[in-house]
């Protein structure tokens, strides 16, 4: 399990966000304006946005600042949500991290992989936590806080932590756990790009340390080793003896070499297969759902079996 220093060292809440998270929008175009309104309607503290050419104005009810350093100085923002188009998104991530953000959530798709290598390096140097890119963001129903494009009406405060590479399957799992009366503690969409910030293990560790999270749904897809790495950590810590974990892997029918949606969803050289991931997770004590419609049913059964409901 994780020590309390895990939270303190990152200068942020254990589950990335809480009711006091102050968010700044980078990329206040049509999408940035639309989703910033929805976030505020939900209850998120969105304190401003950055646009170098429109500093001093008000857009979508938000004060506009010249750069990230200025918005941090003026608002004490500690999290950034990025809608900047792909050519400038990496620079926006780096600017946010170097301005002192504890969390950066990048929605942008099609960021060049070479750019993301630079971003990952800066994130490591600054201690900033990156979620994404190419992700729906994250949501915490209990504090009415969300960063991203996740629809809020299917979520309800509760016991299940969800970590997913797929946006739509995130919503499937959330709706199922809401219908089952379990609800969600925090839901994190980590994105499907090859060079993502947070991976499954990073989020599962936080769920393991969080007292509100009593069960976990892990949603993966073909390609990469994020799911296998999570399975190794789950097995090492014997997590499933304390908290049930249910997993679904998308792309089981994908032919080798065929990309399935996300840039990272590709089986190459015999690695990253759905079966390989299922095998690793099952060996770690994770219950496998081979159909997304079973995720809610299986986590309910596991929670009941362990006396958590």
From Swiss-Prot:
> Could you give one GO CC term from the UniProt record?
hydrogenosome lumen
Binding locations of substrate: 171
The kind of enzyme this is, by top-level EC class, is ligase
Q: Which reaction does it catalyse?
A: GTP + succinate + CoA = succinyl-CoA + GDP + phosphate; succinate + ATP + CoA = succinyl-CoA + ADP + phosphate
Subcellular location(s) of the protein: Hydrogenosome lumen
Q: GO BP, one example?
A: tricarboxylic acid cycle
Pfam families from the entry?
CoA_binding (PF02629), Ligase_CoA (PF00549)
Pathway given for this chain reads: Carbohydrate metabolism; tricarboxylic acid cycle; succinate from succinyl-CoA (ligase route): step 1/1
Residues reported to bind CoA: 54, 107-109
Family named by the database record: Belongs to the succinate/malate CoA ligase alpha subunit family.
Q: What does this protein do?
A: Succinyl-CoA synthetase functions in the citric acid cycle (TCA), coupling the hydrolysis of succinyl-CoA to the synthesis of ATP and thus represents the only step of substrate-level phosphorylation in the TCA. The alpha subunit of the enzyme binds the substrates coenzyme A and phosphate, while succinate binding and nucleotide specificity is provided by the beta subunit.
Q: Which HAMAP family match?
A: Succ_CoA_alpha
Name this protein carries in UniProt: Succinate--CoA ligase [ADP-forming] subunit alpha-3, mitochondrial
Q: Which organism is it from?
A: Trichomonas vaginalis
């Amino acid at each position: 399990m994780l020590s309390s220093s895990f939270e303190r060292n990152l200068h942020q809440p254990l589950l990335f966000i809480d009711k006091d998270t102050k968010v700044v929008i980078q990329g206040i175009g049509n999408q940035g304006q639309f989703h910033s309104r929805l976030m505020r309607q939900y209850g998120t503290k969105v304190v401003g946005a950055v646009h170098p050419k429109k500093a001093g104005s008000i857009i979508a009810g938000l004060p506009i600042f010249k750069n990230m350093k200025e918005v941090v100085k003026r608002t004490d923002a500690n999290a950034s949500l990025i809608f900047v188009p792909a050519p400038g998104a990496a620079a926006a991530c780096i600017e946010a991290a170097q301005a002192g953000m504890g969390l950066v959530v990048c929605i942008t798709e099609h960021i060049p992989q070479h750019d993301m290598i630079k971003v990952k390096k800066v994130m490591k140097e600054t201690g900033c936590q990156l979620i994404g890119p190419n992700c729906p963001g994250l949501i915490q129903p209990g504090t009415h806080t969300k960063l991203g494009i996740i629809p809020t009406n299917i979520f309800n405060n509760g016991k299940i932590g969800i970590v997913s590479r797929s946006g739509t399957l995130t919503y499937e799992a959330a709706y199922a756990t809401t219908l089952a009366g379990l609800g969600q503690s925090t839901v994190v969409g980590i994105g499907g790009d090859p060079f993502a910030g947070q991976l499954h293990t990073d989020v599962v560790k936080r769920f393991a340390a969080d007292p509100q999270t009593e069960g976990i749904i892990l949603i993966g897809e073909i390609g990469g080793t994020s799911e296998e790495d999570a399975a190794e950590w789950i097995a090492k810590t014997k997590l499933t003896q304390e908290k049930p974990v249910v997993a679904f892997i998308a792309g089981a029918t994908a032919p080798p070499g065929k990309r399935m949606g996300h840039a990272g969803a590709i089986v190459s050289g015999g690695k990253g297969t759905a079966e390989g991931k299922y095998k690793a997770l099952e060996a770690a004590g994770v219950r496998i759902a081979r159909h997304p419609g079973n995720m809610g049913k299986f986590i309910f059964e596991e929670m009941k079996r362990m006396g958590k409901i």
